[in-house]
UniProtKB/Swiss-Prot annotation:
Gene: cobQ
Domain of life: Bacteria
Statement: the UniProt record of this protein carries the keyword NAD: no
Keywords, comma-separated and alphabetical: Cobalamin biosynthesis, Glutamine amidotransferase
Role noted for this protein: Catalyzes amidations at positions B, D, E, and G on adenosylcobyrinic A,C-diamide. NH(2) groups are provided by glutamine, and one molecule of ATP is hydrogenolyzed for each amidation.
Organism listed in the record: Pseudomonas fluorescens (strain SBW25)
Active site as annotated: 329 (nucleophile), 427
Name of the protein described by the UniProt record: Cobyric acid synthase
Pathway it works in: Cofactor biosynthesis; adenosylcobalamin biosynthesis
Pfam families, sorted: CbiA, GATase_3
């Protein structure tokens, strides 16, 4: 069994994308492969079939490997709930919340979970394709590292180092990162990959020759900048949009400090009839057809932030003029009358007034609800699938007019009597073409084009595998993967 690890010189260097590409490339070679990320810090997460929580990037990588997502693919997930602390999720389950200093001491325990998951995957698959986190050259984080070289040393695996040339300084990034590694760690780096290159490769070649001579390590390949590649972002919000049709629906999403699962909006960003705008701090909410209140890892503090930016008033004005409002998960909770956090799960214990737009209240409880679901969106009786990730238990008369009827017999969410407001706990509801079309019609778009988001993602995964085949040294990759 072989393990190959991809590490990056910086965050967003292309690690997630490269692991996705390599997984599909190996599948094309007839080799079963499992993706793996020892430790992930992200507010975008997915739910596995067994009801665990992992990073969404690993769920996409699982799709590339033709596998169902599993908690062993991301044994440690950190979900920030403040500027200095995170909820710690081990093997898909939240075990505690702690600040960065406490977590540094906790890493020895987390490493046990990491190695156990890797061992299980190694027994089940010929190749385990590993994604590092951030950069291996973060000197302050070297002690007790479980995400990069600490893991590579523990399992004795080779490493490829990827850097983003589009940011500039690619040779400094690669050489500097290598110089900051220990001799044994340097020996693990078997080659470099340069990502997002634009222009004539002949102009880059002298630099590649210098890099190989300077380090004694090969350049495995240069990946081109791909303009219209749209895979789910792991961290930052992807604001790119495709060209839009003449008739568009204007959708606005206020960006909250603890926004979670903003990948919910990727299908809208890619829809030819939707003009999706993210509104940041200090910006007014512009005229729109639909305002969506997103998920949040800290609902009460994000409610306070929403009010401080004047967005509560903007939502009320939007409704007076006939606009539609949709709340997803934490956004659903904000639509109600009260949000109670008696245990201090998302910050200081206490209660906050909601927006008071729907007649229910929410209490945060220790046991998190994690499940993949299917059902019918009661708008047009449209089929919908999605996933629940929430600690809130919502009760009240407003739930009698549900938004979704689930196949397991439960109802979900609520609608206002006048039909202007809808809330649901379901993440990913726009990924189902029928539900997306129904929601866009509800928001005011008359002639809706159906878009198959899953087919778009599959197309992009195939394109990534083409890039591996056409731009990387596949013989060296075969050698490193032991195939």
């Amino acid at each position: 069994m072989s393990t190959l690890m991809v590490q990056g010189t910086t965050s967003d260097a292309g690690k997630s994308t490269l692991v996705t590409a390599l997984c599909r490339w190996l599948i094309r070679q007839g080799v079963a492969v499992a993706p793996f990320k020892p430790q992930n810090m992200a507010l975008n997460s997915a739910v596995t079939a067994e009801g665990g929580e992992i990073g969404r990037a690993q769920a996409v990588q699982a799709q590339a490997a033709n596998l169902a997502p599993h908690t062993d693919m991301n044994p440690v997930l950190l979900k920030p709930n403040s500027d200095t602390g995170s909820q710690v999720i081990i093997h898909g389950r939240a075990v505690t919340s702690m600040n960065a200093v406490a977590y540094h001491d906790y890493k020895a325990i987390a490493m046990q979970a990491v190695l156990a998951s890797h061992a299980r995957l190694s027994e089940a698959y010929p190749v385990v394709m590993v994604e590092g986190a951030g950069s291996p050259a973060e000197i302050n984080l070297r002690a007790n590292d479980i995400a990069n070289m600490g893991f590579a040393e523990a399992v004795d695996c080779p490493v490829l180092l990827i850097a983003d040339i589009n940011r500039g300084g690619v040779f400094a990034h690669l050489v500097g990162t290598l110089e900051l590694l220990s001799p044994t760690e340097q020996a693990r780096v078997k080659g470099f990959i340069i990502n997002r290159f634009r222009g004539d490769i002949a102009l880059l070649q002298p630099g590649l020759d210098w890099l190989e001579a300077r380090t004694g390590k090969p350049v495995v390949g240069v990946l081109p900048y791909v303009m219209d590649l749209h895979l789910e972002a792991e961290d930052g919000i992807d604001r790119r949009q495709i060209d839009k049709a003449a008739q568009v629906l204007k959708v606005v999403v206020p960006v909250l400090p603890r926004i979670s699962n903003h990948t919910d909006f990727d299908p809208l960003r890619l829809h030819p009839q939707v003009d999706l705008q993210f509104v940041g701090p200090g910006q007014p909410i512009p005229a729109a057809d639909l305002i969506i209140l997103p998920g949040s890892k800290s609902v009460r503090s994000d409610l306070a932030y929403l009010r401080a930016n004047g967005w509560e008033t903007a939502v009320a004005r939007h409704l007076r003029y006939g606009g539609k409002v949709l709340g997803i998960c934490g956004g659903l909770q904000m639509l109600g009358e009260q949000v109670h956090d008696p245990l201090g799960l998302e910050g200081p214990a206490g209660s906050s007034d909601g927006l008071g737009l729907l007649a229910f209240s929410t209490t945060l409880e220790e046991e998190k609800q994690l499940r993949n679901v299917r059902g019918r969106l009661l708008l047009e009786d449209a089929q919908v699938s999605g996933y629940e990730i929430h600690a809130g238990v919502t009760t009240g008369d407003g739930l009698s007019n549900a938004a979704v009827l689930l196949d397991d017999g439960r109802s979900d969410g609520a609608q206002s009597a006048d039909g202007q407001i809808l809330g649901t706990y379901l993440h990913g509801l726009f990924e189902t073409a029928a539900a997306c079309s129904a929601l866009l019609r509800w928001a005011g778009l008359e002639d809706v084009q159906a878009v198959d988001y899953h087919a778009l993602r599959e197309r992009d995964i195939e394109r990534l595998a083409d890039l591996v085949e056409n731009h990387l040294d596949t013989e060296l990759l075969r050698e490193l993967c032991g195939i």
